[in-house]
Amino acid sequence: MGKEKIHINIVVIGHVDSGKSTTTGHLIYKCGGIDKRTIEKFEKEAQEMGKGSFKYAWVLDKLKAERERGITIDIALWKFETAKYYVTIIDAPGHRDFIKNMITGTSQADCAVLIVAAGTGEFEAGISKNGQTREHALLAFTLGVKQLIVGVNKMDSSEPPYSEARYEEIKKEVSSYIKKIGYNPAAVAFVPISGWHGDNMLEPSTNMPWFKGWKVERKEGNADGKTLIDALDAILPPARPTDKALRLPLQDVYKIGGIGTVPVGRVETGVLKPGTVVVFAPANITTEVKSVEMHHEALQEAVPGDNVGFNVKNVSVKELRRGYVAGDSKANPPKGAADFTAQVIVLNHPGQIANGYTPVLDCHTAHIACKFAEIKEKVDRRSGKTTEENPKFIKSGDAAIVNLVPSKPLCVEAFQEFPPLGRFAVRDMRQTVAVGVIKAVNFKDASGGKVTKAAEKATKGKK
Amino acid sequence: MKVEALDKFWADKSRYDLAEKRFYEGPQKVTDRSHYSPLVSEIAKAREHIQNSLEKIDGVTLDDGLNSELAKRLAQLEGEHKELKTQVSLLNELLTATVKRLETQLKLTNGVSKEPEVEAKKPEANDDDDDVDLFGSDSEEEDGEAARIREERLAAYAAKKAKKVQIIAKSNIILDVKPWDDETDLKVMETEIRKITQDGLLWGASKFVPVAFGIQKLSISCVVEDDKVSIDWLTEEIEKLEDFVQSVDIAAFNKI
C-alpha cells in the first residue's frame, strides 16, 4: 500500500435483503482488507469440502461467521482499495443506535452507496415509505453526505434475469425517490450489479450488453464508467480542512505522573503543533501546548483525522473535561455558545415537541441538555422554504428551524464552518428522536477565563 | 500479542469446530427429549415471561390518548381493508364471468376481437384504486395501475419471504474504553467489562492500544442482536465501572 492514495469513507445503505452486505463483502474480499492467509485458508477449506465452485460464497459465509463470533477486531476487515483511494466502508446496520453514531461517530462518510434489489417485490419492499433505507438516506443527505451512488443489485434474479426493462424501471423509481430526499439524480451514478456473481462490480459484465455505462454531471467535472468500482473511483475527494481554524473536541483528560495534564481528542479541522497557544472553550482557559503524541510517537504536526494527546502546563485535570473544544487562541478561537439556531428534523418522537422541550443533545463529544427555546418555523426539508410560522408544536417527520439554549456551557459551531461541530443528535428515552444541523451560533463574549503563565510567556516570546 | 496471534493463525480451530458442532447439535437433541429438556423448558418459560412483559409494556405505551386512537383507526382500516378485499375478489369473479360471456357472445356475433378484454381491464384497475388508498400511499402522481403492480409484487415477495428463515439482525461494534490514567489496570478493567452480560450480547476479542504519553486504551469488540441490546445501555454499564473507566467511544459500528 503506497502512501499517495487518499483515504475516503463510504457508508452503504439499503434494505436488509438488498444484498448490500454481499456487495460490501465482495469489494472487501476482492480489493482489500482481509489478509491473504485467511482467504487462502478458507479457499482451501472450500476445495477440501468439494465446494470449489462455490468458493466465493463459502469464503463470504466464513468471514461472516467469524464476524458473528467477534473473534477479530481488525478494522482492516472494513477496508479496501480502488485505483485512486483507500476506502473505509461502513455497512450501515439496522440498529437504532447507529443513527447517533452516524452523527457523533468517528468517520463522516464522503459518499453514500444505496443498494436496492432488482428482484420482483424486493425492490418495492426495500424502498417502502416506512423503511429504514429512507431514514438513512435522508440522514446522510442532511448530515452533508452530498455524493451518492446507486447499485441496482441482484440483477441476476430479475425476471427475466439481467432485464434491461426492470433496471430502467427501478432507475426511474429510485431517481424520483432520491430527488425527494434532496439528491440530484443527474449527479448520481446508477450501476446494475450482482454483488453475488460479480457482474459490473470490478469488471464490465457480459450478461448486460445493453448497459452502456453510467454517467454523472456535476459542476466539479463529469464522469462516466461501467462498473461499481469505477463509480467509487469517481467520488470527489474530500477537502481535508487543514487550512481552517483548529478545532479539537476533547474525549478524555489524563493526569500522568512526570508529564502533567494530557487532553486527548481528534483534530477535526486545522493543525495542532507543539508551541501552539490553545484556548479551551467554553471554559476559556488559555495555555501552551508542550508536545503532541499519537500512538506514543511525538508529532510535529497533527492534522484532521489524527487522534492525539497533547501535554499542557499549569492546567489541572479538573479544569478540563470531555466536550470542551481546543482551538488556536490567535486564529478564530472557539467560544461558548449563548444560544444557537438549528434546522431540526424529528425522526421518531412518540408525541409532540413544543417550546420548552429540553432533551439531551449529543454534539461532537459533548453531551448536554438544551432547551427548545423557540420553534421559529416549520420548513420544507428539501427546499428550506417556510411552511408555517411559529408552529405550536412539531412531530415525527417535521423539519423546523429552532432556537436552542444550552443548560450548561457548551461549544458548538455552524455546520457550514465546522461540520463535525455543527451537527447533533437529540436524545430522549434512550433514542435518537431528532437530528439537527446548526445554522448560526450566538457566541458568548469570551471575557474572563484563565490565562496560564506558560501561555503568557509563549505569547510574549513571540512578540 | 495473544490477540494478534489469533488474527493471523487459528491455533485452536478444533475447539471452535467442536463448539460449532455442539451448537448445531443442541437444538436437535432437544427434540429428542434428552437430558437437556428441563433447562430448555426453563429457558422457554423465561422467554415467554419476557415476551409477556414486553407486550404489557407495549400496551402501556400505547395507552396515551393519541396512540389508542391510532390503534382504533388502524383496526378500523384493517376491517375496511378486509371488506374491500372480499369485494374486490367478488368483483373479479364477476368480471371474469362477464368477460367470458362477452367473448362467447362476440364469437357468436363477429368472430374474435380483443377489444372487450381491454375494456374489461379498465374497471378492474379502478376497483383496486380503493385498495391503494388503504395503504396510505400519498404520492398523487402515482396512477392506479402502477400502484396495483407494486402491491402485487409486494404480495408475491412477502409470500416468498415468509418461507425463508428470518435472519436475526446483528451488529459488530468496536468500543474504545479509556482509563483514568497510566496506572489504571486495564486487565482488571477488561475482566470487569466482560462480566456485563445480557441476552443477545457476545463479547469478542480485545487488545490494548497505545494512545499517547504511556496511556493505553482497551479496544474490545462485541456482537449484539439489534433488537435486544441498546448500545447506550451498554456504554452506560461500562461507564458505571467508574474506578476504571473515564469514557467509552464507539470506534466502529457495522452490520453483520
Swiss-Prot record, chain A:
A single MF term (Gene Ontology): translation elongation factor activity
NCBIfam families: EF-1_alpha (TIGR00483), PRK12317.1 (NF008969)
Domain tr-type G: 5-242
One of the protein's GO biological processes: translation
Function text: This protein promotes the GTP-dependent binding of aminoacyl-tRNA to the A-site of ribosomes during protein biosynthesis.
Species whose genome carries this gene: Drosophila melanogaster
Higher taxonomy: Eukaryota, Metazoa, Ecdysozoa, Arthropoda, Hexapoda
Residue numbers carrying 5-glutamyl glycerylphosphorylethanolamine: E301, E374
Region (G3): 91-94
Residues covered by region (G4): 153-156
Protein's UniProt name: Elongation factor 1-alpha 1
From Swiss-Prot, chain B:
Disordered: annotated segments: 110-146
Alphabetized UniProt keyword annotations: Elongation factor, Phosphoprotein, Protein biosynthesis
Domain of life: Eukaryota
Keyword DNA damage applies: no
GO cellular component labels: cytosol; eukaryotic translation elongation factor 1 complex
Subunit and interaction comment: EF-1 is composed of 4 subunits: alpha, beta, delta, and gamma.
Protein name per its UniProtKB record: Probable elongation factor 1-delta
Organism field: Drosophila melanogaster
Gene that this polypeptide is encoded by: eEF1delta
